[in-house]
């Protein structure tokens, strides 16, 4: 998504797809969608879905998400956004941690592990 990246968006290994961390960059503009965590989170999930779809996968293939929040006080907003995006059941496993900083001033970054079968 970010034009100056020095990494792969995703790598397949051992029947799994591992994505790099995604931030709330709109791929069409190369800009952060908002300074607010909710629009950033939605864009991150859309970016992950686009990577999955490029590999003929979908949200049901996700087995684990690692979430990095700039402020753990945004945890409830994160949960609300996940319900909107995934529905109310069958969430993937998830770890969420607070971090000191994220690329491009992002408030949330998420990476994903998805099964390829």
Locate each region found by the language model.
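Short, polar/acidic, helix-capping and beta-turn segments at strand->helix junctions
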Residues: 3-117
